[in-house]
């Protein structure tokens, strides 16, 4: 792969800001991208439909009204197969990369060993995703094209929000497969993660959980998803940046063929819109802040 991104390729990142009436909320969508650059498809051993299994399919539609609620939205437009923005740059198993790169990766966790590191390399029932192990040029191209611009855009959005309001709330939105029996959190259809209190104060997590319960679905805290690289990196309650990860069961809005079910998606999108309004107003002292557009 070339080190430099071609100028004819579509944008990898989108930042959408509210047209009127802002709120101290930033929504991140790291896994909703559906663009597969030609370089990625050429390097793939797996088919595009197999690579699409990595996506948080159509989760961006859940956040379709986020800017109406006053939130800024930062979205990866390129697919997760390019790079996983919810992993750190060092999160890879040494065995998943070319020999000359192995020294820079160590102590991999369960997800990395399963091939779900910063560059996804394997999937269950598919096997290796790429024709050859990642070399230095391929890794650099992926990180420089998607991963680093995404986090730079997210940092900028949070800093601008905090500068305007004195604080910021990050909602990192994902979707998940149904949690199987025997796994922690089984039965929950919305999982709220704050890394067990590290990335958000209790009032925010309580507000998100209460809103999800009013929506009428089972909710879990931190089980089985406590929050990944995004909330761990950007959540700094002591500096005025609260961050929660929200995982939503895909069965709530997708058909079995993984296409959106508009009849079920609309109430979910409306719920998320209302949630953003609620947490904007729930911050202690928020009564003195400008209100988001209705």
Describe the residue ranges of each PLM region.
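N-terminal catalytic or cofactor-binding beta/alpha core of small enzyme domains
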Residues: 2-170, 175-294
